[in-house]
Amino acid sequence: MFGVTLAELSASLGDPVLALGLAAFALLLLAIPISFWMVSGGSNSAVVTLLVALANLVLTAQLVLRWWQSGHFPISNLYESLCFLAWACTLAQLLVERSLSSPIVSAAATPMALLCVAFASFALPETLQEASPLVPALRSSWLVMHVSVIMCSYAALLVGSFLSMAVLFTDRQQTLELRSSSIGTGGFRQAKLATSAIDQNDGLRLSSINLSRTEQLDSLSYRTITVGFLLLTLGLISGAVWANEAWGSWWSWDPKETWALICWMVYAAYLHTRFSRGWSGRRPALVAVAGIVVIVVCYIGVNLLGIGLHSYGWFFEA
């Protein structure tokens, strides 16, 4: 799928938009091994943050240039939407790192943006990478409102879900019990260690370093997913209004609409377990990780099928 000939790579370098995409790919590719090295060494993640910030600036320049070339908001085909999603993921990562500057955050979040840029640059055929005129139905101000909000919601949900995945790796044999809301300061929590690790004389032992890091990741994932869920809700509502204006129907059970609703329900279940049932740690993290699969099916799977109003086209046939 990712086979790219030397001639195709040379042609990409000749197109400034595609060249900027390759530059962002190189920066993110460099950031990932450094972030994992910093996780193992416990070093500061400033270098990775700088690389991700540079990648975000490059992607910004790419989107602005494509906007200027095409004359419309650059989110009308699969290549543009993938680059926009990568831009939103890097922005979400930078915002999260303002709350917790940790190499674990970089190691968890950076691969998502890299995969988006890699898929856009190396997997898609040239016909799906080129700018094309908008079809009449997309020539609406709702394009920017609806699609950009949906893409930003995916970015926040994916970054939050990958942080939840990091919770699964850092929460070694510990179960976090929520004593107050994770939103804000995080409240008070305690750790129940595995039975084999409990000293009957000492009772409950607390590992302050591991617990603190896991707590922070757990709280950050909760807050990030909450923001993503609100954006997804806004995106679905704006999409329904747009659909009613364009086709006279609020909801048509298009494959993308159906999977977007499933995605909304998965993350609604995640927030319900956190807010109403008081879950934290591993159990809600597993729900968030399941959400990653649903987003991939909703965003990429529908396009592979090439059916429905939201499909960018079946790129295997391009």
From Swiss-Prot:
<feature type="transmembrane region" description="Helical">
    <location>
        <begin position="75"/>
        <end position="95"/>
    </location>
</feature>
<keyword id="KW-0812">Transmembrane</keyword>
<feature type="transmembrane region" description="Helical">
    <location>
        <begin position="17"/>
        <end position="37"/>
    </location>
</feature>
<feature type="transmembrane region" description="Helical">
    <location>
        <begin position="287"/>
        <end position="307"/>
    </location>
</feature>
<keyword id="KW-0201">Cytochrome c-type biogenesis</keyword>
<comment type="subunit">
    <text>May interact with ccs1.</text>
</comment>
<keyword id="KW-0793">Thylakoid</keyword>
<dbReference type="InterPro" id="IPR002541">
    <property type="entry name" value="Cyt_c_assembly"/>
</dbReference>
<comment type="function">
    <text>Required during biogenesis of c-type cytochromes (cytochrome c6 and cytochrome f) at the step of heme attachment.</text>
</comment>
<dbReference type="InterPro" id="IPR045062">
    <property type="entry name" value="Cyt_c_biogenesis_CcsA/CcmC"/>
</dbReference>
<dbReference type="InterPro" id="IPR003557">
    <property type="entry name" value="Cyt_c_biogenesis_CcmC"/>
</dbReference>
<dbReference type="Pfam" id="PF01578">
    <property type="entry name" value="Cytochrom_C_asm"/>
</dbReference>
<dbReference type="InterPro" id="IPR017562">
    <property type="entry name" value="Cyt_c_biogenesis_CcsA"/>
</dbReference>
<feature type="transmembrane region" description="Helical">
    <location>
        <begin position="258"/>
        <end position="275"/>
    </location>
</feature>
<protein>
    <recommendedName>
        <fullName>Cytochrome c biogenesis protein CcsA</fullName>
    </recommendedName>
</protein>
<comment type="similarity">
    <text>Belongs to the CcmF/CycK/Ccl1/NrfE/CcsA family.</text>
</comment>
<dbReference type="GO" id="GO:0020037">
    <property type="term" value="F:heme binding"/>
</dbReference>
<dbReference type="GO" id="GO:0031676">
    <property type="term" value="C:plasma membrane-derived thylakoid membrane"/>
</dbReference>
<feature type="transmembrane region" description="Helical">
    <location>
        <begin position="224"/>
        <end position="244"/>
    </location>
</feature>
<feature type="transmembrane region" description="Helical">
    <location>
        <begin position="104"/>
        <end position="124"/>
    </location>
</feature>
<feature type="transmembrane region" description="Helical">
    <location>
        <begin position="149"/>
        <end position="169"/>
    </location>
</feature>
<keyword id="KW-1133">Transmembrane helix</keyword>
<feature type="transmembrane region" description="Helical">
    <location>
        <begin position="45"/>
        <end position="65"/>
    </location>
</feature>
<dbReference type="GO" id="GO:0015232">
    <property type="term" value="F:heme transmembrane transporter activity"/>
</dbReference>
<keyword id="KW-0472">Membrane</keyword>
<dbReference type="GO" id="GO:0017004">
    <property type="term" value="P:cytochrome complex assembly"/>
</dbReference>
